[in-house]
Amino acid sequence: MTYEQVLQQVVDNYPSLQTTAIAVERARLESVRVESQLGWQLNAKAGVQHDMSSTFGTPTDTLNLNGNMSRMLESGDTLGFVADINRLDADSSFPGAPNPALSTNVGVNYRMPLQKGADNTSFVQNRLQAEVAVAQANADRRNVYDQIAAQVIDLYINAATINARIENTRLAIQRSQRLLKYNQSRAGLGIAEDKDLLQVRAQLRSREAELTALDMQWQAQRINLNRLMGRDVDADLQLQRATDISIGKNTDDMLQQATQHSPAMAVIDVRMKQADTALELSRDKRKDKLDLVFNAGYKTLSGDSTPSDVSENEVVGGVQIEFGRGLDLSGYDAELQQAQLLRSAALQDQKQVLLDLRYNIAGVLAEINAGNAALSAYEKSVASEQAKLNEAEQRYRRGRSDTDQLIQFEAQLATAELNQDLQSIELTRRIHKLQLLLGNVWKTVKVE
């Protein structure tokens, strides 16, 4: 399995990653709640009352039915409708006054904020805050995914390192077995000394013990990876290291891509939006209240009267201006300064994150370039050690070299081969680290 395949299974099965998706959904529902603030609000009331007229002391029965419906528009204006029915029945009344009297009123009113609340600043900022909450949840989720991916890189590379040591030890065992078999055949002819056989056997037993210890380490690492991937504990695991280590972009392009992916940069963007939101709200709070209110309606009045019944109706309407001012603005000024300081801090952190990203990318690229050079050197070292061992084996077969030297040369070749493999693995680690910085790993690994 490649690193991407391992990470995909970890992502699909890791419990805490599912929790981050729940957090994002909760934040998204906040946007729905904010949007509902523009919905219609319905209020109604009904009541009866027996009282005494404050003017003439006449017992009076009153029935009242009232209903109104209103909503705030996205512009900040408020539209409302009202309907009202009143029935008044007094024990006595003046001539000409209807008794009982029934009055009705239906109307519409419209409130237009001219300063504080204009453009519905509060709602707009609440909407932005909801969007910011979603962005924050997504940034937190991205950060968790990157942390898991970084942990999987370490686990995968550690497992690959153990695997490389196992393969290297197996090759060394095969060479020791060939040398032992050769010396046993020579001993059968009486031309090999006992010390040669003892030396080769000792080397072989040492390699076999080393392989046993490495196999124990591999089993523990395999179980750990299988647990993360949600696989059976005893499931077989074959690792396949990436062979394509090409970069293909310059540092500036990489920095731009890393900036777009960076969870830290996303969090700072969220903080900037929060600061801007707080600034707008603080500025709006400092404004005077100046509202223009229109109303229009239709009223009727009817009832029994002497000498004739009453039935009147009239179209009514009006306009008024409402004004209000806070006399102590120090609290609003403090809020405004806090928002400005919050934004300044976010800007400074943004500069630091960009600087860290640039240095991280430059550092990884330098490590990759140095790693490529080191890998090339190790490849040449392996070729030299192999040639040296081949020449020593030929001399050994002609009796011109001893067993000590052959064992030494085999150990040196095994060390060179292991160093080459380990350097290749470390180079792979740097490549995966760079791909994670750039966010490229998530183009292959799918996230729900």
Label the model's feature ranges.
Residues M1-N64, M112-Q125, Q129-E131, V233-K273, ...:
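Bacterial Sec-pathway N-terminal export signals of envelope proteins
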Residues Q18-I22, E35, E74-A101, L114-D140, ...:
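Sec/SRP-type N-terminal targeting helices
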Residues A46-M112, L239-G248, L279-E280, D284, ...:
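Small/polar, glycine/serine/threonine/aspartate-rich low-complexity segments that form flexible
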Residues V132, N138-Q257, E367, Q412-L413, ...:
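Periplasmic alpha-helical coiled-coil/stalk elements that build and connect Gram-negative outer-membrane
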Residues G190, G230, G399, G439-N440:
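Short helix-capping/hinge motifs at transmembrane helix termini and TM-loop junctions
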Residues L214, P263, Q423:
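Metallo-beta-lactamase
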